[in-house]
Regions:
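A general marker of short, structured functional hotspots
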Residues: 10, 41-44, 52, 139, ...
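M16 family metallopeptidases and their MPP-like homologs
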Residues: 1-5, 56-77, 85-192, 207-215
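A generic structural signal for well-ordered alpha-helical segments enriched in polar/charged residues
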Residues: 20, 128-135, 197, 201
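Short amphipathic alpha-helices in soluble, non-transmembrane regions
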Residues: 14-21, 124-129, 226-227
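His/Glu-based metal-binding/catalytic segments typifying zinc-dependent metallopeptidases
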Residues: 5-6, 10-91, 231-234
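In a subset of proteins, long, contiguous C-terminal domains/tails are tracked
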Residues: 189-234
């Protein structure tokens, strides 16, 4: 398979010069021999020791494994969780340099913190995120801001190369070519009530997602989460 970015004239000139790139070689007997095989993921519950006095933690999963359908409203919920609840609880109260929740398309939901002085307090606050979202009562201006920030990210102009990468990803992932537009429409139509209805699923994600940590030895040792500790420096 090949991907090309350019005008129709450049496209024709490219193939005239490149030939078939060997893409037609073989009779199918070797099909799949050199294919990338991704192993089935499993939770190793690992904490990797690095030279640091802080940590970087993530709790993430593929929501499809939990039977959760991630629509555009999830992006708005991610903004609300990141810039309201998690910011106040983990950044302000907990002292982490940064934190957030992301809903990347339909295939990843993730809590994360970085430059975090402690593991367990942040995990506990992640586990309470769904409860907070379930009682979410924003004022109109704040809620509109969450929506605008989501949609503006989708509407930002991109250069041809970036657009090609986006389309390649859509094709290789087997996504609907119109999924991006549909997701944008769902963002604009999101309501506070719809976000509240996601609270129970956020609680499930926090409870059932694997956790991985990179951090200093002392920070990891203070955690009671029972990590399998891996020393990256031997």
């Amino acid at each position: 398979m090949a991907s090309f970015t350019g005008s129709d004239e450049d496209f024709d000139a490219y193939w005239d010069a490149a030939g078939d790139l060997g893409l037609d070689a073989g009779d199918g007997a070797d099909a799949g021999r050199n294919a990338l095989v991704v192993p089935e993921p499993r939770d190793r519950h690992e904490a990797f020791v690095i030279p640091s006095d802080i940590c970087f933690a993530a709790r993430a999963c593929d929501p499809r494994r939990l039977g959760i359908d991630v629509t555009g409203a999830w992006a708005v919920a991610a903004n609300a969780l990141s810039y309201d609840y998690l910011w106040n609880e983990i950044r302000v109260k907990g002292g982490a340099y940064g934190c957030g929740f992301r809903a990347a398309g339909e295939r990843q939901t993730a809590f994360y913190t970085y430059r975090d002085p402690a593991v367990d307090p942040s995990i506990e606050r992640m586990e309470r995120a769904g409860e907070w979202l379930g009682s979410f009562e924003p004022d109109e201006a704040a809620f509109e801001g969450f929506i605008v920030s989501c949609v503006s990210g989708m509407d930002a102009p991109v250069k041809p190369y970036a657009l090609t990468k986006r389309r390649n990803t859509t094709y290789l992932a087997g996504l609907d070519p119109h999924a991006r537009e549909e997701r944008r429409t769902q963002m604009l139509a999101a309501t506070p009530g719809e976000l509240r209805s996601l609270g129970a699923d956020v609680t499930r994600i926090a409870a059932e997602s694997p956790t991985c940590v990179f951090g200093g030895r002392d920070v990891i040792a203070k955690s009671n989460a029972g990590f399998n500790v891996v020393d990256l420096l031997g």
